[in-house]
C-alpha cells in the first residue's frame, strides 16, 4: 500500500499533467477554428476545378489527351502519397490514415504490383516504415512550416509529376483524412494520376450547356491538370490540419477528464488512509492513557 507521501506526490503529478492537457486542449481549439475555415474555404475551389476538368475532358480524347489524364495505359507501378501529421497526441488520427494506406499497399502487393510510397508527415512515415521500409521512396518534412501555404503543396505536386514524366509509376493515389467534425475525420484515398473526375464533378457537367475553349481543350488540360494536382494536395493538407486539431482537442479533453477521475480516486484513497492513520493514533493514545 502506498504511503501518504507517495499518494500526495501522485496527486500533485496528475494535477500537473491535467494542467498541461487542458492547455493543449485550449490551444488545439483555437487552432481548429482557423484550420476548419481554411479547409472549408478550399473545398469549393477544389470541386469547381474538378468540374471544369471533367467538362474539358469530354472534348478531348485519343492522342490529344495529356498523359496525366490518360496515364500510361498500365497499372503495374503504384505511387502512394500518404499525408499525416508531424506530431502525435491526437488519438488515432495518424494511425487511421496509415492503416488505409497499408491495406491498399498490401492489396496491390498481393496482386503482384510494384508499390512506392511518399510520406508527408513524420507520424505516417514512422508507422509505415515498420512494414514497408523498402518501399519508402521519399519523405516530405513539414515540421518547420509554421503556416501551411499553397507553395508547399505545389512542391509536392511538381515532385510527383516529375516522377511520372520519368516513368517511375503508372498510378498515383493520395491518402489523407477528410475533416467532418471535431469527433469525425474520415480517412480518404483519392486518385491523382491518371486524373479522374469525381462523381460530383461529373454531375455538374451533365447539363446541356456547350462550352468553347481558347486555346484548344488539350492545351488547357496540359496546363490545368498539373495545377489541379497541386490544388488537390493542398486541400488534403488543409483537411489534415483541421482533422489533426479536432482529434487533438478531443484527445486532450478525454485526457483532462481522465486525469480528473484519477485525482478523485487518489484523493479518496488518500483521505481514507489518512483517516485510518489518525484513528489508529487515537486508539494508541487512549490505550496508553488507560494503561496509566
From Swiss-Prot:
It is a peripheral membrane protein. The keyword Cell cycle does not apply. SUPFAM superfamilies: ATP synthase (F1-ATPase), gamma subunit. GO terms for biological process: proton motive force-driven plasma membrane ATP synthesis. CDD domains: F1-ATPase_gamma. One of its GO terms (molecular function) is proton-transporting ATP synthase activity, rotational mechanism. It is found in: Cell inner membrane. It holds the Pfam family ATP-synt. GO terms for cellular component: plasma membrane; proton-transporting ATP synthase complex. The keyword Heme does not apply. Keywords: ATP synthesis, Cell inner membrane, Cell membrane, CF(1), Hydrogen ion transport, Ion transport, Membrane, Transport. Signal peptide: none annotated. F-type ATPases have 2 components, CF(1) - the catalytic core - and CF(0) - the membrane proton channel. CF(1) has five subunits: alpha(3), beta(3), gamma(1), delta(1), epsilon(1). CF(0) has three main subunits: a, b and c. Belongs to the ATPase gamma chain family. Produces ATP from ADP in the presence of a proton gradient across the membrane. The gamma chain is believed to be important in regulating ATPase activity and the flow of protons through the CF(0) complex. This is ATP synthase gamma chain. The lineage of its organism: Bacteria, Pseudomonadati, Pseudomonadota, Alphaproteobacteria, Hyphomicrobiales.
Amino acid at each position: 500500500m502506498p504511503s501518504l507521501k507517495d499518494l500526495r506526490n501522485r496527486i500533485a503529478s496528475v494535477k500537473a499533467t491535467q494542467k498541461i492537457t487542458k492547455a493543449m486542449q485550449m490551444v488545439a481549439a483555437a487552432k481548429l477554428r482557423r484550420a476548419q475555415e481554411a479547409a472549408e474555404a478550399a473545398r469549393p475551389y477544389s470541386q469547381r476545378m474538378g468540374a471544369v476538368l471533367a467538362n474539358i475532358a469530354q472534348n478531348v480524347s485519343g492522342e490529344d489527351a495529356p498523359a496525366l489524364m490518360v496515364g500510361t495505359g498500365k497499372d503495374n507501378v503504384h505511387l502512394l502519397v500518404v499525408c499525416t501529421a508531424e506530431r502525435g497526441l491526437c488519438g488515432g488520427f495518424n494511425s487511421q490514415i496509415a492503416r488505409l494506406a497499408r491495406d491498399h499497399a498490401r492489396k496491390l502487393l498481393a496482386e503482384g504490383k510494384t508499390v512506392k510510397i511518399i510520406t508527408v508527415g513524420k507520424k505516417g512515415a514512422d508507422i509505415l516504415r515498420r512494414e514497408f521500409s523498402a518501399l519508402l521512396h521519399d519523405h516530405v518534412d513539414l515540421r518547420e512550416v509554421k503556416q501551411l501555404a499553397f507553395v508547399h503543396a505545389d512542391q509536392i505536386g511538381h515532385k510527383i509529376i516529375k516522377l511520372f514524366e520519368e516513368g517511375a509509376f503508372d498510378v498515383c493515389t493520395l491518402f489523407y483524412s477528410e475533416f467532418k467534425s471535431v469527433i469525425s475525420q474520415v480517412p480518404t484515398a483519392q486518385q491523382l494520376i491518371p486524373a479522374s473526375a469525381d462523381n460530383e464533378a461529373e454531375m455538374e457537367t451533365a447539363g446541356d450547356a456547350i462550352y468553347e475553349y481558347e486555346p484548344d481543350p488539350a492545351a488547357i488540360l496540359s496546363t490545368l491538370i498539373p495545377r489541379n494536382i497541386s490544388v488537390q494536395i493542398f486541400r488534403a493538407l488543409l483537411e489534415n490540419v483541421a482533422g489533426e486539431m479536432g482529434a487533438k482537442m478531443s484527445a486532450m479533453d478525454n485526457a483532462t477528464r481522465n486525469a480528473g477521475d484519477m485525482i478523485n480516486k487518489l484523493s479518496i484513497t488518500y483521505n481514507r488512509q489518512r483517516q485510518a492513520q489518525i484513528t489508529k493514533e487515537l486508539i494508541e493514545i487512549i490505550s496508553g492513557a488507560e494503561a496509566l
